[in-house]
């Protein structure tokens, strides 16, 4: 028996060696007209599913059977190149491919949606269509067509991702829900793959594309809520001089100039710069609401050697916006809101949400040989924000109500660093795409007070009287006698193996993660405070999270996949809960996902489709119940970490061109959520902020001959009704909503003009981000005109 086994192994290895001897290797580099590398160019063997993508230095590696081939090299905005190559057995063929730009009349050609080639958040060079996970990328095409300058406009183009409200009005920060689960401010948001806090408007003019990786992504990012990760990939310096000026003006006294300037700093163009900056000031359809923000982001890229490159970025943001709590219903129902003017303002005009952030990024990339790269990324952020607002109580039948005030200052410092190696190699006929990395993230933040509610004045819903009480802004010092801590460390590895001439892919990966979070108390500051006698309560969790996926590509343009992934969330002790001491060391929340899907590029690769089925199970979630559910008080609740919540559904994303002159970005989602176990709420309840049905479509018409330069766009965005709380209070069920948008523009040489009309039917829609009788009114009809000028040489 042993002899037979040895003979079988010998025959197997002999066969592999024989196969390998009939193969050769294609290596080389893809360059532009300046001799600079083109990252993420597609190299495809004509008539085959075999292909690859160039890395950040333009390098590529492809192992194929000996023979004659046509190698097709494509890159967005460049003329494709077809090159005949001869591959000899047991030999290496080196190529240098130079691409030239197409004449696009200064229009940047962008591919986004599900047709995007790569997503930087995957930390690999794999094409999106080859990854066993649903990924959607929103790029410049959508940003420009929809004249977007906030996240709510962009994210409505992604199926299964729902905007659920603002913290303190449109000028603060946004809440999102994905696949039935809320995204967490300290977990689910990334900038160039590095964790950032969601405490301000994260849209910025230096964003090249917004990437959404759906489902649990703990293997790459550690403890994150299972709905998905939202990553912002920034613009990089260009080798040629480029200037873009953009001015938006519109209703509600909007004025928004923006500048994008880039070019080389030396003759060899190895040192390049880019600066994005903007200023925005506007009022609102809501009475007495206004906001002002400015932004600047300088970037330097330096190709130190042909193998070593360094990219340094700074992002400075500053915003001030009116507090806007929304509306309270006269009778506690959504229907009762019809009795109120959507413009009614219930806060104080002097109350502002202030946000300041300075972020710095350093990315060092070194190419090891022709197919490996080593990358180190460092990020540091310093954030200060000051919520200061009003929380109105429910009114009596005559409209009398009490207004409460809150306010605090918060300081936050965030540091992250990653080191990863990624490369491709072969073992016999099996191609490996290996990613190995280390990651560390550290956050420290403090508050000046707990943000409790204090009574401000007695008022009336139908006749609000402002300025009854003198304003006293929240003190900037002292901080509370503790520091909130988050420390994350992880080591991860994944390999996507390609078999059968790359028709069959197997992805396996695992992450070992260590997270510590909680509160560290300062002994010298405790005496005389409510926290006297408290001790450090830090929760440490060690978790192994696996990931496995299978991809089958019957054709180069189509793939089907199945995947399984695990995720986790570390819960900090809730010091504001009345039963805080009972849960000073809460357990982690665990999640699992099974996903099946298919991706395809049809109509001669013009139109991309992604269809996904998924099920996510979340166990031991954080939950809370108010002491008096019928009359809940903001700060009177108990917490628990128990239960089983499930979400499953179907998602469709479509992006591309139906014809050469008609493009589409569309999506639809069916999301079925359910409470399977929960000590606080009935089994069978739906999860909050998760509409059962959502849909979106944006059509854009651009003539290619007659009337060239004209663009016409139209969009429809629908959201089914949903509950704002897990107790499924029918009075707080947010009704169905929709908006219709239109756009018309014209581009003449370097000049452009575009008019966008949002919510043209003037629908009054609501959200309820706070579970209480407090509804956020969504924007009414608005006209925005964009004037643009571009110069490039």
Predicted regions: what is each one?
Residues 615-617, 640-726, 786-793:
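Gram-negative outer-membrane beta-barrel transporters
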Residues 130, 137-140, 154-157, 173-216:
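Periplasmic plug
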Residues 280, 284, 297-367, 380-412, ...:
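Acidic/polar loop-and-plug regions of large Gram-negative outer-membrane beta-barrel proteins
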Residues 303-305, 412, 431-433, 439-441, ...:
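Structural signature of Gram-negative outer-membrane beta-barrels, strongest in the C-terminal barrel
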Residues 29-36, 41-46, 72-78, 88, ...:
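Short, acidic, small-residue-rich periplasmic hinge/interaction motif at the N-terminus
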Residues 618-619, 659, 664, 717-727, ...:
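C-terminal beta-signal and adjacent terminal beta-strands/loops
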Residues 206-208, 219-296, 304-308, 358, ...:
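Outer-membrane beta-barrel translocator/receptor signature
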Residues 367-369, 373-379, 383-389, 587-648, ...:
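Membrane-embedded beta-barrel scaffold of Gram-negative outer-membrane proteins
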